[in-house]
A protein has these predicted regions:
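Conserved SAM/AdoMet-binding glycine-rich loop
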Residues: 178-365, 370-372
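Canonical Radical SAM [4Fe-4S] cluster-binding loop centered on the CxxxCxxC motif
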Residues: 136-178, 183-185, 197
Length: 544
């Protein structure tokens, strides 16, 4: 046998041996995961698992997550559960999972460990946003509280239970500074205070915001996220997350410069650095000096952008004064969010808006509660008042209608099925259909508002009863005259006929109305409600 044959023989033998090893590894891990052997006590990796719960209507998946974590943690007692849902439904969570949740905020020392650290005052770990592919809407903002709790105890609100003690002032400048150095600076500041104007230290709060770098003339230049990521990789801070960041930065760089960086692309490909699941720390650091100048050039061209502050949960209209609005104007707040929960407050709300505008604020917003104890027409009145104020004062107000859910009611806490005493399924569905077309918000523009919600209260009530397909594809059905035909038939019903037809329409269930009435005129009206969105889309496609 010649030398070449001998070498070929040993090469094939090595390949076979390697393939056998790989095959055995694949068999092992297939069995390991198929049989869920990672749940066995000897294979559990985690000494402590923390779970933050959110909305109560995520009940099922949250409970599943807690029970899953119990199987991963070395000791079940070291599974920690807290957050909104766990606080509101503490007893139910314990009953189902056997884990007793932490209630409220971790605002005292020694709750989790025997030390003097107060968890609630620690900076957030923004690196977790680098772990996911989903781009969090508020990813470019610091998140913080400058107060906790609320002095009001509104019956529809969970804040008194979540944050029972009102705290007038929490500093944030050091948090912002540390987070900026660790994770890279962020453009905006999102404050989650529930009632900041109730604070007796409001002026101090505004000054602290300025100290944190948010003044009216402050600008933001995007940090070199490649350098931020490499710095954290070097010290071993959340390496998995920042390897993903580095790979994303490579992709941005190559996308921007294209064929000009063919050599860099070839190098990254050779080092398996173009995919986060193949990229390794050593390869990133090895190629760092080669790619560093290109990132410096790319980031040197970033333009300054204006920074903004947002008290995201809104401020109390009843506490707005000339003085605090002028003080608020010292920081780049946009928008000023003023709660408008009830029509009964419309005079106070309108005065608050005018006061804010007189102080210089022209970008406003609010949350508009509905499906609570309000009449449907009261939602219309509040939205229209905002549009009227926009027209009169030449300002911008964006309204966000928020549907009420009784989060502690045993029949409704885990779903979104609750219908207020003055509402019904059809009315709720109409509002949702309109808001879907406006992306959940109602802005300025009188003609648009009139088309979306009606020019007066009568038109709004007509809209509430309108077939859903005719709401979603308003122009199409109006154009072919079908909307007018439906409305004429509806109006021609007698009071006695409406007494039969309206409850059927309000149920928003048109599957078997033939069994509920044999009145031909009512049946004719109800037939319009069986027009589906798919029918309209097909018809519009044919017309094109």
């Amino acid at each position: 046998m010649d030398v070449a044959s001998i070498l070929y023989f040993y090469h094939q033998k090595r390949l076979l041996l390697r393939n056998i090893i790989i095959l055995e590894l694949l068999k092992y891990y297939r069995r390991y995961f198929h049989n869920e052997e990672y749940f066995l006590p000897e294979n559990r990796m985690y000494g402590r698992v923390g779970i933050t719960t959110l909305f109560t209507f995520f009940w099922d998946i949250t409970i599943d997550t807690i029970n899953f974590a119990k199987k991963l943690c070395k000791d079940q007692k070291d599974v920690m559960v807290g957050g909104v849902m766990a606080t509101i439904l503490k007893e139910r969570v314990y009953e189902i999972t056997g884990i007793e949740p932490f209630e409220g905020t971790l605002s005292s020392a020694g709750i989790l460990d025997d030390n003097d650290i107060i968890i609630d005052t620690l900076p957030l770990d923004y690196s977790i946003l680098e772990e996911i592919d989903y781009v969090y809407p508020a990813h470019d903002g610091y998140l913080a509280y400058m107060t906790r709790g609320c002095v009001n105890h509104c019956p529809f609100c969970a804040v008194p239970k979540l944050e029972p003690e009102y705290k007038n002032y929490l500093p944030i400048a050091e948090q912002v500074d540390w987070a900026s150095k660790q994770f890279g600076g962020k453009k905006d500041l999102l404050l989650l205070d529930n009632n900041v104007l109730a604070s007796c230290q409001f002026d101090k709060i505004v000054e602290e915001i300025k100290k944190a770098g948010f003044t009216n003339d402050s600008v933001f230049v995007e940090p070199n996220m490649f350098e931020v990521a490499v710095k954290n990789i070097k010290v071993g801070y959340n390496e998995k997350a920042y390897i993903k960041t580095v790979v994303r930065q490579y992709q941005i760089l190559i996308s921007k410069y294209g064929f000009k960086l063919q050599g860099v692309y070839d190098l990254l490909e050779k080092k398996y650095l173009l995919k986060d699941y193949t990229a390794k720390k050593d390869a990133i650091l090895e190629t760092y000096d080669v790619v560093k100048p290109y990132f410096e050039e790319m980031y040197s061209k970033k333009r300054p952008r204006k920074r903004f502050v947002d008290f995201n949960q809104g401020i109390d209209a009843r506490l707005i004064t000339d003085t605090n609005m002028k003080k608020l104007f010292e920081i780049p707040i946009r928008p000023v969010r003023i709660a408008f929960d009830h029509w009964e407050l419309h005079e106070i709300y309108e005065k608050a808006v005018r006061t804010a505008v007189e102080a210089g604020h022209t970008s406003l917003s609010n949350y508009v509660l509905y499906n609570y104890e309000d009449e449907p027409v009261e939602l219309y009145r509040r939205l229209k008042l905002n549009v009227d104020l926009c027209e009169e004062l030449n300002i911008s107000i964006y309204s966000f209608p928020m549907k009420y859910h009784p989060i502690e009611d045993p029949d409704y806490f885990s779903n979104r099925d609750y219908i207020g005493e003055n509402w019904n399924r059809k009315f709720i569905r109409t509002i949702q259909a309109v808001l879907n077309s406006t992306k959940g918000k109602v802005g300025k523009g009188y003609s648009f508002f009139c088309k979306a919600f009606g020019s007066d209260e009568d038109e709004f009530m007509k809209l509430l009863y309108m077939p859903e397909a005719m709401i979603i594809y308003r122009f199409y059905f109006e154009g072919i005259g079908l909307t007018d035909k439906w409305w004429n038939c509806f109006q021609n019903l007698t009071d006695a006929q409406l007494a039969i037809a309206k409850p059927i329409i309000e149920s928003n269930d048109f599957s078997d109305y033939e069994n509920l009435t044999d009145d031909l005129e009512i049946l004719n009206v109800l037939s319009y409600y069986r027009i589906r969105r798919e029918d309209a889309e097909r018809a519009m496609g044919k017309d094109e």
